[in-house]
Swiss-Prot record:
The gene is SUN3. Residues 1-47 are nuclear. Residues 1-39 are annotated as: Disordered. Residues 103-142 form a coiled coil. It is a single-pass membrane protein. One of its GO terms (molecular function) is protein-membrane adaptor activity. Residues 1-10 have a biased composition (Polar residues). Keywords: Coiled coil, Membrane, Nucleus, Transmembrane, Transmembrane helix. It is found in: Membrane; Nucleus envelope; Nucleus inner membrane. Gene3D superfamilies: Galactose-binding domain-like (2.60.120.260). Self-associates. Interacts with SYNE1 and SPAG4/SUN4. Proposed to form a spermatogenesis-specific LINC complex with SYNE1 during sperm head formation possibly implicating a SUN domain-based heterotrimer with SPAG4/SUN4 associating with SYNE1. This is SUN domain-containing protein 3. The chain crosses the membrane at residues 48-67.
């Protein structure tokens, strides 16, 4: 009997822990567990980190969008800046062009005034020479007058003789002034523009291009101060009033005022004394003249080759070396060389003389 109770007791003892375990397990399922304070702190820190990351992401996206908008707007601003710079440059260039134009006109006025001043000096020199001659004649008159008094000659006759000499001196002065005003060549010029002559551009060299002689507006040259080829057919010979062509060789085809048999030509250039540069290296040196048949389009007939002497007189006339049997309306001038200018040759005036055709 004592063994059975022990087995029951042992069984009780054996089940007791299972009941306790079961009761413990059931208790653990029902009763709440205690929270860990370290775990809750980590959760809050992660939330703060995620919030900061989110805010930084938003700021980064906003910055990127701002840069994209700025990059899109920059080309427009750059174009506006370039447009302002271009407009400023154009205004500055136009302002400089307006400044250049009065300078060029002032230079021309200076050249003309210098020429007039030189002519005035020559006239004053001639007047001084005339005054010297007058003084010498007065001395002679005084000597004659004294001689007349010593020879017991009537004084009235001496005074009359003095008046005659004064009149002769006045006539001499007028004659000298008349010669100064007259043409030195004393031959008709059938290449004179005012008489009806002209330059045929189709048979004439191109003019020398000089950008400094242009007036600009907004960067576009619209007014040219270069002299045309027909300036060589006009009597206005002043520094700068010449036709320039590039290089040392060129030609000009001239239609005369009427048909003539050419006998001579005249070349005129300014002197070194009135040249603003102090030299006339652009003056023509060797040149030849041809007659052209059939209304300026036919055969060329050689009339002569000549040399313009830059140290001689400014107006030089040359007799033609070959005669033509018929009347000509056109003459061609060919410049073969100049006096050393490397860029251009300048012609001031060219004349053609001869025997005109009798229209009657």
């Amino acid at each position: 009997m004592s063994g059975r109770p022990n087995s029951r007791g042992s069984s009780r003892l054996f089940r007791a822990p299972s009941e306790d375990a079961s009761s413990g397990s059931s208790g653990s399922a029902v009763l709440p567990q205690e929270e860990n304070p370290n775990a809750s702190g980590l959760t809050r820190s992660w939330k703060a980190v995620m919030g900061m990351v989110f805010i930084l992401t938003l700021l980064l996206l906003g910055f990127i969008n701002h840069m994209k908008l700025k990059e899109k707007a920059f080309p427009q601003k750059s174009r506006q800046i370039y447009a302002v710079i271009a407009e400023y440059g154009s205004r500055l260039y136009n302002y400089q062009a307006r400044l250049r134009m009065p300078k060029e006109q002032l230079e021309l006025l200076k050249k003309e005034s210098q020429t007039l001043e030189n002519n005035f000096r020559e006239i004053l020199f001639l007047i001084e020479q005339i005054d010297v001659l007058k003084a010498l004649l007065r001395d002679m008159q005084d000597g004659l007058h004294n001689y007349s008094w010593n020879a017991d000659i009537d004084p009235a006759e001496g005074w009359n003789h003095t008046e005659v000499i004064d009149e002769e001196m006045s006539n001499l002065v007028n004659y000298i002034l008349k010669k100064l005003r007259e043409d030195q060549v004393q031959m008709a010029d059938y290449a004179l523009k005012s008489a009806g002559a002209s330059v045929v551009e189709a048979g004439t060299s191109e003019s020398y291009k000089n950008n400094k002689a242009k007036l600009y507006w907004h960067g576009i040259g619209f007014l040219n101060y270069e002299m045309p080829p027909d300036i060589i057919l006009q009597p206005d010979v002043h520094p700068g009033k010449c036709w320039a062509f590039p290089g040392s060789q060129g030609h000009a085809l001239i239609k005369l005022a009427r048909k003539i048999i050419p006998t001579a030509v005249t070349m005129e250039h300014i002197s070194e004394k009135v040249s603003p540069s102090g030299n006339i290296s652009s003056a023509p040196k060797e040149f030849s003249v041809y007659g052209v048949l059939k209304q300026c389009e036919g055969e060329e007939i050689f009339l002569g080759q000549f040399v313009y002497n830059k140290t001689g007189t400014t107006v030089q006339t040359f007799a033609l070396q070959h005669e033509v049997p018929e009347f000509l309306l056109c003459v061609k001038l060919k410049i073969l060389s100049n006096w050393g200018h490397p860029n251009y040759t300048c012609l001031y005036r060219f004349r053609v003389h001869g025997t005109p055709k009798d229209d009657s």
